[in-house]
Curated annotation (Swiss-Prot):
This is Replication protein A 32 kDa subunit A. Residues 19-32 have a biased composition (Low complexity). One of its GO terms (molecular function) is DNA binding. Heterotrimer of RPA1, RPA2 and RPA3 (canonical replication protein A complex). Interacts with ROS1. Binds to ASE1/At3g02920, PDX2, At5g62350, RPA1A/At2g06510, ARF1/At1g10630, At4g18590 and At3g52630. GO terms for cellular component: nucleus. It comes from the Eukaryota. PANTHER family: REPLICATION PROTEIN A 32 KDA SUBUNIT A (PTHR13989:SF34), REPLICATION PROTEIN A-RELATED (PTHR13989). Strongly expressed in shoot and root meristems. Present in seedlings, roots, leaves, siliques and flowers. Keywords: DNA damage, DNA recombination, DNA repair, DNA replication, DNA-binding, Nucleus, Phosphoprotein. One of its GO terms (biological process) is DNA recombination. Pfam families: RPA_C, tRNA_anti-codon. Belongs to the replication factor A protein 2 family. Phosphorylated in a cell-cycle-dependent manner (from the S phase until mitosis). In response to DNA damage, recruited to DNA-repair nuclear foci, as a hypophosphorylated form.
């Protein structure tokens, strides 16, 4: 999963991520997730921040750095151990000087394959992707990667990390914590109603095609794309999907596994909660 960086300990990147992720914390229940902010944009981070975040949260919770729930992140670093043995994916390791993280890039389209041609071992790249934790391993599901032509971009990325960390310091997180918690508490009582209301279009759309039913893949994706589902940071439990879409769980599990393998959905806090990939 993670390993020590190939850079020397006394290099310019030593110290690991510039800022320690002491405020990083896990959310272990839906009540505590309300205290964390979900940042929808790309969060500039270092591998060490991700490593410390994963070590503190373990497998019981999501990944949170300084009160920010990590969804999409951006990193810069050196490409190592590129593996193109599979037709549909390319795997490689990113070393940013603070640590290493495994990465995977799907190459289902011509554009994806062309993008990865310029990414070779020893190349500095900037990449963006989703953090995914499954069975004790964390990897980055990459949706964008490009070589760095100007090394100033590496320096700028670390300045971004420092700036973002400073903006979301402990004092600022406490100031907005009460407001965020009160807003979530206000709408908590109506969550079930909203979920039921938004479910109707999905269920009724089963009869939109010529055969009278949509295929299971589309039904599951449509359900996970609903605002009520995307707003839930912990993802949707597979039992809920089975119940709401009236699909036998044993049949649903195979479809979900296929969608995850195709990179259309990803697991969140454990192997039973899922969210769709926002492209």
């Amino acid at each position: 999963m993670f390993s020590s960086s190939q850079f020397e300990p006394n290099s310019g990147f030593s110290g690991g991520g510039f800022m320690s992720s002491q405020p990083s914390q896990a959310y272990e229940s839906s009540s505590s997730t309300a205290k964390n902010r979900d940042f929808q944009g790309l969060v500039p981070v270092t591998v060490k921040q991700i490593t410390e975040c994963f070590q503190s949260s373990g497998e019981k919770s999501g990944l949170v750095i300084n009160g920010i729930s990590l969804t999409n992140v951006s990193l810069v670093g050196l490409v190592c151990d590129k593996d193109e043995s599979k037709v549909t994916e390319v795997r490689f390791t990113l070393d940013d000087g603070t640590g290493r993280i495994d990465c995977k890039r799907w190459v289902s389209e011509t554009f994806d394959a062309r993008e990865m041609e310029s990414v070779r071992d020893g190349t500095y790249v900037r990449l963006s992707g989703h953090l995914k934790t499954f069975q004790g391993k964390t990897q980055l599901l990459v949706f964008s990667v490009r070589p760095i032509m100007d090394f100033n971009e590496v320096t700028f990325h670390y300045i971004e990390c420092i700036h973002f960390y400073s903006q979301n310091s402990e004092s600022q997180r406490q100031q907005v914590g009460d407001v965020t918690q009160s807003v979530n508490t206000t709408f908590q009582g109506g969550s079930n109603t909203n979920q039921a209301t938004l479910l109707n279009p999905v269920v009724s759309s089963q009869n939109n095609d010529g055969n009278g039913r949509k295929n299971l893949d589309d039904m599951i994706l449509d359900y996970l794309k609903q605002p009520a589902c995307t707003a839930r940071q912990q993802g949707i439990h597979i039992d809920e999907i089975a119940q709401q879409l009236k699909i036998p769980k044993n049949k649903l599990e195979g479809v979900v596994q296929s969608l995850e393998g195709d990179g259309l959905i990803y697991s969140t806090i454990d192997e039973y909660h899922f969210k769709h990939v926002e492209l």
